[in-house]
């Protein structure tokens, strides 16, 4: 509740700043939620806390403000209809998962940690309207690595930054993946379910964002009519 109320408050002041706060925090929370869902989190029941979780190092990095993440779903030819997603996840000869394809309209696409929904299974029954969704898997992709010499090795290519009417303080990017190393989250074919784990929470956050923007508009109207 505190998280959503603070989202509302920040949206009232500046929606781009709110996006950085709520979206990047949500990526850290999603890492924890995904780890719990797949069974890679252990709990210290006696003290009522988490003992360990799969992505603890990444979560700590985000919490320190040293990195942030994003959710890569939309593609040039597929958005709301996720069954049409074509970005592909496959294993190489050594069992390493790799992502190949394109994603567009990605909020904070310049971030370090990317949750990528990609196709790992082909449709077996074309007459099944849900066949395309069952072939999706969730991956965590590191967009770049920082090198000891201060340089940076980039794995995910930023093709362009979108031009927008607003939200100028928040980056929206088009991305390309060319055999980029990835970590599978959960099991193959569970990508749609994992996506809902993140997006259902995000929908509530967007609602609070809308409340904040409405409050801002009402206050601006009050000032305009009294001056």
Question: Predicted segment positions?
Answer:
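Short Gly/Pro-enriched turn/cap motifs at secondary-structure boundaries
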Residues: 77-80, 105-107, 129-130, 164-171
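A short, Trp-centered hydrophobic/proline-enriched beta-strand micro-motif
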Residues: 65-73
């Amino acid at each position: 509740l505190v998280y959503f109320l603070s989202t509302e408050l920040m949206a009232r002041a500046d929606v781009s700043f709110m996006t950085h706060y709520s979206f990047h925090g949500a990526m850290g929370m999603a890492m924890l939620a995904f780890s719990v869902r797949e069974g890679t989190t252990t709990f210290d029941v006696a003290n009522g806390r988490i003992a360990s979780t799969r992505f603890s190092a990444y979560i700590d990095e985000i919490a320190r403000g040293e990195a942030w993440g994003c959710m890569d779903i939309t593609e040039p030819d597929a958005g709301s209809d996720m069954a049409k997603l074509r970005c592909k996840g496959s294993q190489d000869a050594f069992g390493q998962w790799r992502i190949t394809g394109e994603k567009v309209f990605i909020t904070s696409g310049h971030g370090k940690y990317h949750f990528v929904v990609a196709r790992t299974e082909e449709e077996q029954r074309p007459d099944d309207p849900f066949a395309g969704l069952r072939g999706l898997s969730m991956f965590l992709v590191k967009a770049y690595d920082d090198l000891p010499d201060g340089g940076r090795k980039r794995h995910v290519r930023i093709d362009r930054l979108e031009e927008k009417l607003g939200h100028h303080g928040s980056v929206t990017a088009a991305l390309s993946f060319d055999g980029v190393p990835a970590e599978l989250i959960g099991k193959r074919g569970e990508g749609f379910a994992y996506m809902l784990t993140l997006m259902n929470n995000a929908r509530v956050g967007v609602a609070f964002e809308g409340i904040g923007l409405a409050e801002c508009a009402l206050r601006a109207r009050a000032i305009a009519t009294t001056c």
